[in-house]
């Protein structure tokens, strides 16, 4: 699969990924699972870079006229914003799937 788009992590998304990998590797004492999660994450990100609209649109009253999308990575949700003109994927957040969506969307809205 050839990537058409480049990706860019927000500082929060970078911190999210670091936190998840540390939690799995250190807190759960399972570095193999952390490596597996990273592999799955990169596979999803590669798919998104090839087909930016592959994820479903996040529908929420706090996001009017936005194209923020989401894709699953295991028990986590990857939130991203495709920029068609710049051919760039902005990785906004990577969060545990049961987190409060309204709270998250308010944060993303200030991107």
Where are the predicted features?
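Arg/Lys-rich, positively charged N-terminal/basic patches that mediate binding to nucleic acids
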Residues: 1-40
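Residue-level signal for pocket-adjacent positions within structured domains
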Residues: 2, 52, 58, 90, ...
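Short amphipathic alpha-helical interaction/hinge segments
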Residues: 21, 49-56, 102
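Juxtamembrane/interface motifs at transmembrane-helix termini
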Residues: 36-37, 54-57, 111
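Compact soluble domain cores
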Residues: 42-46, 50
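Basic/aromatic recognition patch in beta-strand/loop cores that engages polyanionic ligands
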Residues: 51-85
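Enriched for short, Lys/Arg-rich terminal
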Residues: 73-77, 81-111
């Amino acid at each position: 699969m050839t990537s058409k788009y480049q990706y860019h992590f927000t500082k929060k998304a970078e911190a999210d990924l670091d936190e998840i990998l540390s939690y799995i590797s250190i807190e759960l004492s399972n570095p193999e699972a952390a490596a597996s999660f990273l592999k799955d994450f990169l596979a999803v990100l590669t798919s998104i870079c090839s087909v930016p609209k592959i994820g479903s649109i996040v529908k929420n009253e706090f996001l009017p006229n936005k194209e923020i999308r989401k894709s699953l990575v295991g028990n986590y949700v990857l939130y991203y914003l495709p920029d068609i003109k710049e051919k760039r994927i902005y990785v906004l957040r990577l969060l545990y799937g049961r987190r409060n969506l309204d709270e998250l969307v308010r944060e993303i809205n200030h991107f």
